[in-house]
Amino acid sequence: MGLKAMHAGHSTVLIGRRYLEHGFLDVAMRLFVRNAAQVEKRDWSLLVERLMDRHRIVDAVRVCEIGGVPVPCAQLLALGEGSLRRKDFEAAIHLYELGNADRERWARVVDLLSARPDQERRAIALTERYLVGEAPKVELRLAAAN
């Protein structure tokens, strides 16, 4: 990359920071993505934080991937718990998947789903994906220990 192009990239990132400071997240995100190699981790993290504040989950996860910053799992799981309390199963499941929910959380989802006959297939699918897959490993370890 030539010196002129590098300066242009840095200038664009500086302008992206200004847009971010003023709350223009879409413009900041577009400028950061175009010049991803020159954007600092703290800029990506701040953009993710602001996107999460506005509940723009998909954009926040995408920015984490592009910027190489951690996905805000704790926030995603907290939002998932709120969705679960409201019985918004679709949102809760999506947020739990993004936030890498633990076995206990998945068990709660399955418990709530299994209380509703219309959710039978979903409860079975989630059990197979997140609960049953763990059990054989534990049983094998216990068998090996004896």
What are these regions (language model features)?
Residues 6-13, 21-26, 38-45, 53-58, ...:
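Generic helix N-cap/helix-start motif at coil->alpha-helix transitions
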Residues 18, 30, 46, 50, ...:
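Residue-level signature for tetratricopeptide repeat
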Residues 1-2, 29-33, 59-67, 91-98, ...:
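Alpha-helical repeat scaffolds
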Residues 21, 34, 53, 66-69, ...:
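Positions within ordered alpha-helical repeat solenoids
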